[in-house]
Amino acid sequence: MIDCRGVSFSYDGVTPALDGIDLNIEDGEFFCILGGNGSGKSTFAKHLNALLQPDAGTVRINGMDASDPELVYDIRSTAGMVFQNPDDQLVATLVEDDVAFGPENLGVPSAQIAQRVREALKGVGLVGFERHETHALSGGQKQRVALAGVLAMEPRVLILDEASSMLDPRGRKGLMKVCRALHDRGMTIVMITHFMEEAAEADRVAVFRAGRVAMLGAPEEILTRADELAQLNLDMPASCCLGRALREKGVPVCAQVREVDMVAEIAQVYAERSGADVAGRPSASDSRVLDHASSAADGMVASEPVIEISHLSHSYSLSARERRRWRKRSTTVGASGKQTLWGNDPNSPWALRDVSLTVRRGEFLGLAGHTGSGKSTLVQHLNGLIRPQEGSVCALGLDLSSKKGAAAVKAKVGVVFQYPERQLFAETVAQDVAFGPRNLGLPQDEVVRRVATSLARVGLDLAAIGDKSPFELSGGQQRRVAFAGVLAMEPEVLVLDEPMAGLDPAARRDFLELIDRLHREGLTVVMVSHSMDDLANCCDRIVVMNEGAVFAEGTPAQVFAHANELKSIGLGVPAAQRMALSLVQAGVPLRCDKLYTVESLADELAGMLLGCADGPLRASRQAGSKMATQEEGC
C-alpha cells in the first residue's frame, strides 16, 4: 500500500528532516511510528498524502507516485490524515458542515454525505453535536470532529499524527477501538504516537531518529528494549517496566508489552506458587466515590487560600435570563444523555455548573476531567480571562467579577495554555519575555532583570538566545520561552493547561522537573492534565471535573482508589495502579488503600511471590536476575 524508497527532505535545504527513509507498509497493516520530538515523524506523515514532496527518493501510495501533481487528488482521496492540533484542520463553523467538507469535495452525492456524516459522528461519540459551533468545543472534542471529517471520506489509509494527544483516557480508548474496527475491515492504519500502550496494539512499529529509521519490528521486539528506547527519548510501556523490575528482583516473568498479558502472567505465577485460584473478585475500588464537599486532602498542612471559587456557573450560549431559567431545572445529567464510548452531554448548555473549590498557597493542585468537562473554562476564570456569570471568584483578595479586579489579577496569576509556544509573537526571545513586564510599566532595568531571571529559571541563557527569533528555536526551547514570559510577570500562582501536550517522554520528564522546581521555589501551581501518572506524581491534591461540575477531590491516593467511578466518567488511574487493581481482581492480595508506582508495585509483588513458596520460585531467583541483565523480552 505504501512504499518509500530513499526518501529525503529538508525544510531549509541544509538540515535533513528525513534522511534516506526506506519503509514499506502493507495493505491492511496497523503500523505505528514512534520517535522523539524532531525525529521526522510528522514530516514523514505529510509525505504519505502528498502534503510534502521528497527532495530525493520516491513515495508510492497504492502504486501512485506522490510526486506526480496529476495524482495528488487521488492520493489524498486514498490517504486521509488527522493532525496533532485540530485547529489546523477544522474549516467550518458547524460540526456537521466540517465533517461534510471532505466528502463534498470528493463529489459524493448529498444523500450519501448525510449518511457518512451521521456514521462518522457516531463513530467518534459526537451524536447530538451536529449543530454545535466548532470554535466552542473543547480541544478533545475538536480532535474528534477532525477525525470524523477524515472518516467520512472513507479513505483506504488513515494517518494519525499524534491524534490522541489531546484526548482524555476514554477518548484514547475510543480512538483505539475505532482504529481496531477499521483495521479489522481492511483499512491501513499509520499511527504516530508517544503513548507506548497504543504502539503495543500495532502489527509493526518503526522508531525514528534524526530522520532515519532506527528500529523496526513487531511491538514485542521493539518495546522491550529499554536502553535503546531511552537513547531515543522514549520509554517502555509500564507493563514492560514492571516485568523488568520483577526480573531484577528475581521473579522470572517476561516483559509483556500489553498490560492484560502482564497481569495474567503475574497472576498465574502467584497461583502456581501459592496454590490459590486465579479467579475474578470484586475490585477494591467498588466503594462510594469521594464526597468532594468534605474530602480535603488528609495530611496537608492548612495554608491561606489564594483562590476561592464559590458556586461558579458559566454558559457560552445562554443569556442571563436563560441561565436563571435553566438553574431552576435539575443539574443532574441522566445516563441517557451520555455517549458511553466517548462521554458527552450535547444538550447541556453549561460549561461550568455550581463549582466551589479553594486553592491554597503553596499547594500543587491537579485538575482532571474528560474532554469538555469544563477544565479549561475553569482555569480561564482564575486570572480573569473569563469573568463570572454566576457565583464568585476571588483571587489574592481581588474580586474577579469586577473589571478592575480582573485586570489587576493578571500580573499575579499567570496562565500557560496548551501548546504554549503558540503564545510567542515577538521578533526576539528577549522582546517576547519582556512583553508582560513592560506592560506593567516597570523600569527598564527591572524588565531586563526579570527577562534574564525568568529565562534562567527555565534553563535558558539570555546572552545565548536573547537576540534570536523564538521561531528559530526547537519546539522544546519555544515552550520554555513561553513559560519564561509568564514567569517574568513574577506571578504568585502558575496555572498550566495541559503544558506537556505533544512532548516525547524525555521532554515530558524535563518539563515535569521544571514545574516541580518552580513549585518548590514557592509558586502555587494549578495544572490541568489528562495524564493520570503526571497528576499522581506531582500533585498534593486533585480535583476531578465531570460535565462542568466537581465530581471528586482529594489526595492522589484518595482519588485513584476509585478506579471504577473514574472510568465511568472517562478517566483512568496511573498505569501501575491500573495493573495493581487488575491483579486484585485476578486474586492477587495486594493492598487496596495504597497508590502504587511501578517500583513500589514490583517491591510488593516480589516480596509476595518470593515469599509464598520455598521451592521452584526461590530456586529461580538467580536465573531471573541473570535474565534481567540480558535481552529485555523473553
Model-predicted regions and their roles:
Residues 158-161, 494-497:
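Catalytic Walker B motif of ABC-type/P-loop ATPase nucleotide-binding domains
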Residues 49, 383:
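Helix-to-loop junction immediately C-terminal to a conserved catalytic motif
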Residues 34-36, 368-370:
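The feature captures the beta-strand-to-loop junction immediately N-terminal to the Walker
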Residues 154, 490:
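Conserved catalytic motifs of ABC-family nucleotide-binding domains
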Residues 133-137, 141, 469-473, 477:
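Conserved ABC ATPase signature
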Residues 57-67, 75, 391-399, 409:
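Conserved ABC transporter NBD signature motif
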